[in-house]
Amino acid sequence: MNTAILVLIINKNKKDFLSVSLKNDHTDFNLPGGKVEHNETYIQTGIREVKEETGLDVYNLHYLYKDLDNDFEVITYYTFEYQGDIHTRENHIVKWLPIYDLNKSKKWSKYNSMIYNKYIDLKL
């Protein structure tokens, strides 16, 4: 089974999250993340993918949600702890969006709605 890790990075005011545009559609945004590589833990994958896609270092990732879709597993973590400057060498845009925009992704609206609801349920 293939596994992908997403990381919900929430800013200090708890009102915005860091989003990454899709590589082939700069008008649609999602969470930073990607596939788990050989001999990598889920947390290591999340840290690596965030660094690659945003330039930020993230710390203290907490489990939020897991979904199975056919032969693909997607696990989402969240954190409020990050350091560094936003920059990317990949072909996408990185920007802060209001947390309520999380469920507006065109491609991932169902999954992101679940993430949004799980985050709201935490009452952080």
Language-model features and meaning:
Residues 1-17, 32:
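Conserved N-terminal beta-strand and adjoining loop/helix that marks the start
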Residues 9-13, 22, 79-81:
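Active-site beta-strand termini and strand-to-loop segments that position acidic
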Residues 30-36:
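Adenylate-forming
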